[in-house]
Amino acid sequence: MTIRTRVAPSPTGDPHLGTAYIALFNYCFAKQQGGEFVLRIEDTDQVRSTAESEQAIMDSLRWLGLEWDHGPDVGGEFGPYRQSERSDLYKKYAHQLVDDGKAFYCFATSEELDKMREEQMAEGLRPKYDGRGLNHTDDEIKANLAAGKPYVIRMKIPSEGTFKFNDYLRDEIEIPWENVDMQVLLKADGFPTYFLANVVDDHHMQISHIFRGEEWINSAPKLLKLYEDFGWEAPVLGHLPLLRNPDKSKLSKRKNPTSINYYKEMGYLPEAVLNYLGRMGWSMPDEREKFTLNEMIENFDMKRVSLGGPVFDVDKLSWLNGMWIRENLTDEQLIQRFVDWKFNGEMLAKVLPEAKARINTLSDLVDLAGHFVGGIPTYDPALLTAGKADEDVIRQALQFFVWQLEGLRSFDKPAIFAIAKEVATFHELKIKDFLEPIFVAITGKTSSTSVLDAMEILGSDLSRARLRVALAHLGISKKQAKNIERAYREYPSA
């Protein structure tokens, strides 16, 4: 049997460190045994999925040094590798489950389901689908279908007992069926949910082992029951520990940069980032901290993964990155890395048109536009509140601005300005007064090139990181944080 693993990210945002971590461990497991690695794109969310995000995922994984044997850009015998291109297959299998009595139609509207949940919560019950679709007679189902009434297809779940399964990395896990919902398999728009699409794809692509994050443990009964319902052999299933912040909280972009692109833009070496991800819950037999991808593959043993939450510490990554620079790069190689990073024609072409009208000598460019080739600028935090606006208002407005930028699909000047204008208006600030602290946070100065142009050139990850540092300079107490979160719920676009 060919060992075949996969990673299946959704192209709905920035390429995440967690995606790279899961991809790396699946990749090493397969390659250590002479197997194959598959990249599949889960783009069934047609509202949030973008081609730009898909390309960013592939670019970031390749930047790290990971390649795939099968995927949307390289093809393969199991394609297509975008779920949006396999929708007919999912519909076929969803209806097959209905015909086999393993799934059922549900015609309940979203309003009816909202009311159901409200009533359950009012009674102190955990919100859960109540199985109302199971009560439809055959005649009712035929009439609803003939009338073109919208429906979803849900899987049938036992009402009592427990489900037991063996996890590759853990002891036997037992989950009561009462904690498992009647999962929607096919949505009203005809697209599948994660559960159906993944089972169908993993079966057809002959995936032998699935290693995913531990947040999916409670969904394992649904996944494995679908294999049973189809009469297919299930792959080996294992759940890797989640990456954690130094305070042990789940790695989240609201606390620390989580995008692979951020670390690329900050000047980290891909070898060092991949090396550090390889140390997340796993170590070399000789405990050495610095190793290459090939060395990791040669020594990899998934059974040696520690289940305690591995901590992603940026300071430790920086230390390791420094080791890679000093020990692995010649002066000539380091020069080329600098050129590839920021000191190149592509970057200058972005910066010079804006700067040209404001410089008299070439050396003026360093002071005027140095923030384009730096990481996090240093400045006097007092500059953030030197304007007319109240400090508490600026603090909340900046936090709203960061949260709104997180959901921005196209990080360009018009879109950034629109959000800034909306946030300023909500806080009764003049846009000029709101842009002043943003200017300082992004450039580290009170005068330079356009801050909105700078944000577009720097990109989403680095811009948001600089804004988060500004918020840290301003300081947010636990009480203030709660008040800001409460106020954000009233924000129109929250």
From Swiss-Prot:
GO cellular component: cytosol
Pfam families: Anticodon_2, tRNA-synt_1c
Motif ('HIGH' region): 9-19
GO MF, one annotated term: tRNA binding
Primary location recorded for the protein, binned into one broad class: cytoplasm
Enzyme class: ligase
Catalytic reaction(s) noted: tRNA(Glu) + L-glutamate + ATP = L-glutamyl-tRNA(Glu) + AMP + diphosphate
Location in the cell: Cytoplasm
Biological process according to GO: glutamyl-tRNA aminoacylation
Role played: Catalyzes the attachment of glutamate to tRNA(Glu) in a two-step reaction: glutamate is first activated by ATP to form Glu-AMP and then transferred to the acceptor end of tRNA(Glu).
Family: Belongs to the class-I aminoacyl-tRNA synthetase family. Glutamate--tRNA ligase type 1 subfamily.
UniProt subunit comment: Monomer.
Official protein name in the record: Glutamate--tRNA ligase
Organism, scientific name: Pseudoalteromonas translucida (strain TAC 125)
